[in-house]
Amino acid sequence: PNPKVFFDMTIGGQSAGRIVMEEYA
């Protein structure tokens, strides 16, 4: 399975949401 890394990105000091990035090893 591919590990999923969750990045919490903040834009303008506000939470823009959670981005799910799938890294293919």
From Swiss-Prot:
Tell me, what is one Gene Ontology molecular-function annotation carried by this entry? Answer: toxin activity
Q: Which domain of life is it from?
A: Eukaryota
Q: Which UniProt keywords apply?
A: Antimicrobial, Disulfide bond, Fungicide, Plant defense, Toxin
Tissue expression? Expressed in seeds, leaves, roots and stem (at protein level).
Which signals induce this protein? In seeds, induced by jasmonate.
What's noted about post-translational modification? SBTX is known to be glycosylated but it is not known which one of its two subunits is modified; contains 5% carbohydrates.
Report how activity changes across the pH range. Answer: Activity decreases below pH 5.5 and above pH 8.0.
Q: Which GO terms describe its biological process?
A: defense response to fungus; killing of cells of another organism
Other information:
On the 2D-gel the determined pI of SBTX is: 8.2, its MW is: 44 kDa.
Role played: Involved in plant defense. Inhibits spore germination in C.sojina, A.niger (at concentrations >50 ug/ml) and P.herguei but not in F.oxysporum and F.solani. Does not inhibit vegetative mycelial growth. Inhibits growth of C.albicans and K.marxiannus but not P.membranifaciens or C.parapsilosis. Probably acts by affecting the cell membrane. Does not have urease, chitinase, beta-1,3-glucanase or hemagglutination activities. Does not inhibit trypsin. Injection into mice produces toxic effects such as dyspnea, tonic-clonic convulsion and death.
Q: How does it assemble?
A: Heterodimer of a 27 kDa subunit and a 17 kDa subunit; disulfide-linked.
Q: What is this protein called?
A: Soybean toxin 17 kDa chain
Q: Which organism is it from?
A: Glycine max (Soybean)
